[in-house]
Amino acid sequence: MALSGSTPAPCWEEDECLDYYGMLSLHRMFEVVGGQLTECELELLAFLLDEAPGAAGGLARARSGLELLLELERRGQCDESNLRLLGQLLRVLARHDLLPHLARKRRRPVSPERYSYGTSSSSKRTEGSCRRRRQSSSSANSQQGQWETGSPPTKRQRRSRGRPSGGARRRRRGAPAAPQQQSEPARPSSEGKVTCDIRLRVRAEYCEHGPALEQGVASRRPQALARQLDVFGQATAVLRSRDLGSVVCDIKFSELSYLDAFWGDYLSGALLQALRGVFLTEALREAVGREAVRLLVSVDEADYEAGRRRLLLMEEEGGRRPTEAS
């Protein structure tokens, strides 16, 4: 018998469910993507979509990227199960940095956790381990000599003052690689050093494409579909001709302090300011003329998190080794 005053079973709201699984709603994704589109990119998207066959028009009146994406949803061209058109439009704009947002996975905010590093802890560990290895190798050599001859250390020292015996000369001549193998661990090897790769993307582009598209895109074909294809091809050719190029490089880090400093400079904008003088040269400014040019710098957050975990694990393992050895 059910009680009349019993509380109903709790039901999850859509936002709570999405937050639990670390997902973004469709409209929240529209806010993230639309908020990063420039006015020039909005004009280009509205121009391309309004010229499509059967388009209702009116996208040019959109005042923001959010309004434009909401209008696409209202027309049935973009929904939760079909984001193909939005992905194609972002590729036309060369905004590949916005494509990961279409997966609707919420990105966790990352802040650099700085440590008060004096001398590098890994270098200290390397010196300490090398010192311990030299001591252990020297003691192992003396013990091995005692075991081979079966003599006490005092007798072994007296014999080494004079000329070595024939048996010792034969052993030394027959096994020349044994001391080299024992001394190899004493040298710090750089091949086994743990590193992580951080991918850096730098791109220079024009701030506005509208005037160039207005001058270079026109079609006189009577059919709507043919005119749309002609306009789209011309706009793509104009944008490709105005591509100023990009650079993608992988930076290796072996110290956690350097990685945190690099990420902190990226978040604060110091990295962008430092790269501006390297890429926006006088030759580039003379080539573009009076048009405004901007520099875009992107560092993958997933690379930073994975690299930080890797280096932090190396620091923890290196800290446990001296305690286990002692």
From Swiss-Prot:
Residue stretches making up the DED domain: 25-104
Keywords carried by this UniProt record: Apoptosis, DNA-binding, Nucleus, Transcription, Transcription regulation
GO biological processes: apoptotic nuclear changes; cellular homeostasis; extrinsic apoptotic signaling pathway via death domain receptors; intracellular signal transduction; negative regulation of DNA-templated transcription; positive regulation of extrinsic apoptotic signaling pathway; RNA processing; rRNA catabolic process
Composition-biased stretches (Low complexity): 136-146, 175-191
Chief place of localization: nucleus
Tissues/organs with expression: Expressed in most tissues. High levels were found in liver, kidney, heart, ovary, spleen, testes, skeletal muscle and peripheral blood leukocytes. Expression was absent or low in colon and small intestine.
Record SMART domains: DED
Motif (Bipartite nuclear localization signal): 155-173
Entry keyword Transmembrane helix: no
GO molecular function term, any single one: DNA binding
Pfam families cross-referenced by the UniProt entry: DED, TRADD-like_N
Biased composition (Basic residues): 155-174
Location within or outside the cell: Nucleus, Nucleolus
GO CC, alphabetical: nucleolus; nucleoplasm
InterPro entries found in the cross-reference section: DEATH-like_dom_sf, DED_dom, DEDD/DEDD2, TRADD-like_N
Region (Disordered): 104-194
Motif Nuclear localization signal: where in chain: 104-109
Subunit structure: Interacts with CASP8, CASP10 and GTF3C3. Homodimerizes and heterodimerizes with DEDD.
Free-text function comment from the UniProt entry: May play a critical role in death receptor-induced apoptosis and may target CASP8 and CASP10 to the nucleus. May regulate degradation of intermediate filaments during apoptosis. May play a role in the general transcription machinery in the nucleus and might be an important regulator of the activity of GTF3C3.
Domain notes from UniProt: Interactions with CASP8 and CASP10 are mediated by the DED domain.
Official protein name in the record: DNA-binding death effector domain-containing protein 2
